[in-house]
């Protein structure tokens, strides 16, 4: 296959295992985005760490599209659960993406039409990892409160929420590029998250100094931080495993 697959993730933690498994031939910057060019599972890959949010994701995608046109764009990463069935480490394959504005009202809707019609069936053959197919919400802020997640899931009949996918699929549809979104649940609907805005910047980079200060001044949050790290590691491992399965059959 001459055309590569683009794999876009917002955070270093989301893509780190993929980067370690890749045969990296080139590393570069595309604007603010970090890019690794190489192969994984004998498939040509362009791995992109875009940074958090719709604007960063779109900018990163446009940056790598200026170099080459892919066979497929994969939007990957973490998502918050909006359905009681979803547990940490479960995966969501989006068949529809909704973009919700700051007031949590309906904004845009995109249908996902994967080039691989049996994608979901092939992925669900991995019985040890639960995979769901359904609606993914994109908002431009972290949804940290469990009641807010419950309301979003109920109002929009969605399985999960992220911060990047709608801008990626919107541009892919415009450019007629095949698109797939696979997200791993890092926090469940019942779980409220701590506010990380004081130590995580707009590109999703964690300041160790600021995070340390937050932990020192909020000792009760240390347990939650450790738990979230463990959950994120499980989400990353499951996501990477399933993406490897997908590439081996692509």
Place the predicted regions along the sequence by residue.
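Generic N-terminal helix/loop capping motif
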Residues: 18-21, 25, 64-67
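Short, conserved "active-site rim" segments that organize catalytic pockets and cofactor/ligand binding
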Residues: 2-22
